[in-house]
Amino acid sequence: MTVKRFIAAPVLGMLILKSLYLQAADTTEHEVRLLIDAIAASHCDFNRNGRQHTAEEAAAHLELKYARAGKRIDSADAFITRLGSSSSFTGKPYLMSCEGDTLPAGEWMIDALEQIRAHTQSLDQSTVSG
């Protein structure tokens, strides 16, 4: 009986940790996909290494970088910092030009991520209360 409890506790703990890890991975994947979709839908110009690209081209580029990075990206914040803010080859920051205003792509994505999280949180709260 004691042996069963001894085995059950670590197994249960591992299952809980795995569940939390999978939830975090699902959240990361979901948030990164929403960020990439937001870029594609933004109609902003994307400056990468001195060259202008459409929003759709920027989204495709970031999608490719994300696919190559794999599990090394453990949060949407890490996606922005490590992949979305600057060129991995030149180190030059990416820029987004939207309606005449230009700002670093990382800043644009942080703002977008805050909006995504606020919207997701309000949906979660309405699901719980409704």
Give the ranges of each region predicted by the language model:
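N-terminal secretory signal peptides
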Residues: 24-68
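Compact alpha-helical subdomains of small soluble proteins
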Residues: 50-130
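Bacterial N-terminal signal peptides
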Residues: 9-18
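Bacterial N-terminal signal peptides that target proteins for export
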Residues: 1-10
